[in-house]
Amino acid sequence: FFAALFTGGFFIFATYHWWLAAIISGLIAIGVMLTWVWTGTAEIPEKETKDVGLGLSLPLYISGPNAVGWWAMFITMTADITAFVSLVFGYFFYWTIHEEFPPQPLQGPGVFWPGMVLLLIAYGLTLLSRYWNRSGQVSAFYLSLTLAAVVSLAGACALLSGPWLTGLDPTTHVYPAIVWVLTGWTVLHVILGVIMQLYCLARRAAGKMTIQWDADIVNVSLYWHFLALTVVMTVGVIAGFPSVS
């Protein structure tokens, strides 16, 4: 209830440009969500299976494609990337209705490729951390996932630097506006990905995630599959299309 309440508050306050209230509401929503998932999800069971009658035993903990949590992440991100594709469609829609798109002389969009490279490295490190965890290489897990979080933040900053350093003003033309929307969407998802990475580090340190009980890092890796696709599409459209057109 509180997660929904404060998440709704974030969007409502932002609609009216009440930025401080929106930020506070968003932070509270994130805190409530983290508390909920920390205390109520992926709990390590006392035993691996439970007898349900008629000689049938069912596992009490599952990770991967057979788990409800994995499918919840998959369905959520499928809907999420559908919304993202609609934004990409908006970019090309504006191209079809403007004689000159992007406008000339072109201001921006800046250099986006370093950000994409950094975020793909972070993606690889996240997948590697899942492997290290399952292999029992605890130190390697901590190192790879910590580096993934750091590189992710660097990649997000690199993406933002493109339109920021070239002075793209979203109020002057639809082109800089859609560039900022696509960039902001991607960076917001990177920030969520970093929160997930840090969450997995905390779960492993607290003993709530182990070699066998690894639903957290498995689900986060799935999220990063979709995020990597989002990054490639964003950079391909923003940085690649102007040069092609």
Where do the protein language model's features map onto the residues?
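...captures the hydrophobic TM-helix bundle architecture rather than a specific catalytic motif
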Residues: 1-245
